[in-house]
UniProtKB/Swiss-Prot annotation:
Annotated PANTHER family: BETA-AMYLOID BINDING PROTEIN-RELATED, TM2 DOMAIN-CONTAINING PROTEIN 3
InterPro entries on file: TM2 (IPR007829), TM2D1-3-like (IPR050932)
Keywords (A to Z) from UniProt: Glycoprotein, Membrane, Signal, Transmembrane, Transmembrane helix
Protein name: TM2 domain-containing protein 3
Record localization: Membrane
One GO CC term, this protein: membrane
Biological source species: Mus musculus (Mouse)
Name of encoding gene: Tm2d3
Glycan attachment points: 101, 136, 154, 171, 183, 193
Amino acid sequence: MEAAAEPLRSVRHLSRVLLFLSQCYILSGDGSLNLEHSQPLAQAIKDPGPTRTFSVVPRAAENQLFSHLTESTEIPPYMTKCPSNGLCSRLPADCIECATNVSCTYGKPVTFDCTVKPSVTCVDQDLKPQRNFVINMTCRFCWQLPETDYECSNSTTCMTVACPRQRYFANCTVRDHIHCLGNRTFPKLLYCNWTGGYKWSTALALSITLGGFGADRFYLGQWREGLGKLFSFGGLGIWTLIDVLLIGVGYVGPADGSLYI
């Protein structure tokens, strides 16, 4: 019985040895495979391939680009005065550019070639889009226009009731629909002419009825003279009569130097 079991043990021992050798072979083979697969990975790490470059835009160029985009989207200030799809010949002067000639004869009718400014749209008599057209006007500079064709600033610091009559320098601007030569804004020396809201009829009525109490002088803002008339009972009537005449002819006016309404 033991003799029969001895060959069986030898076979088992041999099978274990073969199994051990096969495992070693497999492990050695896997190691070679891992080595072979690891080589491309190591090569890929050493050679990452083509690199992607990124360009950095300078701050100045970025600001310039942003300002250009902002300017392209901004609405020009003159567009607030320019009607859309109106007649080109009736556009305000701020909406067009004309090739004027200052050598024309003063007071004579002249024609000039004009072009609408960018972003302005207008049409001709046939309602067709137009950019170039001709305008008719009178040959004269803007400061030679009638007073009804321009607006001037007022001064509230000069005295209107003065002898000689005072003047002041005003800044005048031509109205939008008026065409002329030269600058549309110009200085001009004007007579002092402004009002503070005082009525001549009210001052005269107070002088006749309540002049003895100085009501007319108080109304005109002359409180010192008003107190003098109040405590002297109108100068015993003489001062009252004199004030009626002075206010009636316009010699006595408001204390702030303005004109009557």
